[in-house]
């Protein structure tokens, strides 16, 4: 295996050494993404954030003079990639009903749920089946109203630990699983039979993305692997800047045409030629002055989105950027960050910022249309966290770790509904076939109208 040298690493590494410390409040929220966080005792005293509140920053910024708008509904039959499609840009997905009522719920990983470790990978909907990858390294296929078709454990023999990295992507009749145990495995979508195994040499950081005959996955030390789907052979690899800390809701690459855009936990966003693996351009979501960031983290934990020739990327360092896909030209940057993949549609970029505000940005300028504070719970041993948004049925949807599902009007930011889910949720909803899907922290998959 030959690793390509990263020509952008030195400058970014030096910049990383100059980053200051951030305050407590945002770190507390992101800390709830940690599946091993059982609610540590919070020290007594008056807690004041030393961060500039993102909502305040937006309020003081020059707001866009127009109104937020979204594109027309798109009938999406499959959610085949972690971000819906290879570009992580599913658009405004059609729903049948759109009121969020529960249709069915199916358990997929009861043993893992009992141990208190949750999955961090989105579920897939492909060809009438639903696929879930859990923290125990098991891929489960469901059909109909959640009936189990097959379940395959990818945990190595003799391995007892659970992991949070990895995930799944679909390519035709193949489900490709990147595991937290250091393997990339191709499974038959109908039977779960193993077709091939590729050695990653270390745990996968997030779910893979499959497109154009290749599957792309990043490991925990920021090595990108491009692997041929047909036979599991290595196409090329690339080593990014190693990063010791990162957010568990890891990002996946985005692919459009002959370019794959890859997010790294170092804060880098690099575009590669899909055929050769040669870098085309590099950018970063790291802020020079980290006044609205998670302490000690520069992670691009949200997947980049490619829409109409523009790459939108964000991270927990507190910056969102828009870049030309073709040449890496920076179009705009805004001092607002997110741990979750933005929803891009119409003239807008929607995201949940690090202060639990749902924000609409002008996709052309980065200026804010509106910012809505989501309902939060702050207790001694529990802080609520929102995951989203998902744009479906002309509404923005988000879920929380205190078991809530809300819908929001995209044009104004008005909260339209607030429903109780069967349990806590940590992964943004997905949508396909007219349904909204929520994977709960206990591994259960719910289908909503």
Give the positions of each predicted feature:
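Extracytoplasmic beta-rich repeat domains
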Residues: 104-124, 151-169, 196-211, 234-256, ...
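C-terminal motif of bacterial Sec signal peptides marking the signal peptidase cleavage site
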Residues: 20-23
């Amino acid at each position: 295996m030959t690793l390509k040298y990263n020509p952008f690493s030195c400058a970014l590494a030096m910049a990383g050494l100059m980053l200051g410390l951030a305050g407590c409040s945002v770190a507390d929220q992101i800390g709830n993404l940690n599946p091993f966080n059982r609610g540590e005792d919070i020290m007594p005293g008056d807690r004041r954030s030393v961060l500039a509140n993102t909502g305040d920053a937006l309020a003081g910024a020059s707001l866009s003079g127009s109104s937020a708008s979204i594109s027309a509904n798109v009938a999406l039959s499959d959610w085949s990639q972690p971000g819906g499609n290879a570009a992580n840009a599913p658009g405004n997905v059609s729903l049948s009903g759109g009121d969020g009522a529960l249709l069915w719920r199916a358990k997929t990983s009861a043993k893992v749920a009992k141990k208190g470790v949750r999955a961090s990978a989105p579920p897939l909907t492909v060809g009438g089946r639903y696929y879930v990858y859990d923290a125990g390294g098991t891929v489960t296929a469901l059909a109909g109203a959640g009936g189990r078709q097959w379940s395959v454990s990818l945990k190595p023999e003799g391995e007892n630990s659970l992991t949070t990295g990895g995930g799944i992507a679909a390519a035709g009749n193949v489900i490709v699983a990147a595991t937290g145990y250091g393997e990339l495995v191709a499974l038959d979508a109908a039977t779960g039979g193993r077709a091939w195994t590729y050695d990653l040499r270390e745990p996968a950081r997030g779910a893979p993305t499959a497109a154009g005959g290749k599957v792309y996955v990043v490991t925990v030390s920021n090595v990108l692997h491009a692997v041929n789907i047909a036979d599991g052979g290595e196409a090329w690899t690339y080593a990014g800047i190693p990063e010791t800390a990162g957010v568990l809701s890891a990002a996946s690459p985005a692919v459009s045409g002959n370019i794959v855009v890859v997010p790294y936990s170092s804060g880098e966003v690099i575009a590669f030629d899909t055929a050769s693996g040669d870098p085309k351009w590099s950018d970063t979501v790291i802020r020079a002055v980290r006044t609205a960031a998670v302490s000690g983290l520069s992670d691009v934990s949200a997947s980049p989105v490619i829409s109409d020739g523009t790459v939108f990327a964000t991270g927990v360092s507190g910056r969102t950027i828009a870049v030309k896909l073709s040449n890496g030209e920076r179009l705009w940057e805004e001092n607002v960050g997110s741990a979750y993949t933005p929803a891009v549609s119409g003239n807008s970029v929607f995201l949940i910022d690090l202060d639990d505000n749902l924000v609409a940005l002008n996709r052309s300028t980065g200026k804010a249309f509106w910012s809505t504070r989501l309902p939060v719970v702050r207790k001694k041993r529990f802080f609520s966290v929102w995951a989203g948004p998902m744009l479906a049925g002309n509404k923005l949807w988000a879920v929380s770790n205190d078991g809530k599902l809300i819908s929001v009007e995209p044009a104004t930011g008005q909260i339209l509904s607030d429903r109780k889910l069967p349990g806590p949720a940590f992964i943004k909803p997905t949508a396909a076939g007219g349904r909204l899907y929520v994977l709960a922290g206990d591994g259960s998959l719910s289908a909503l109208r």
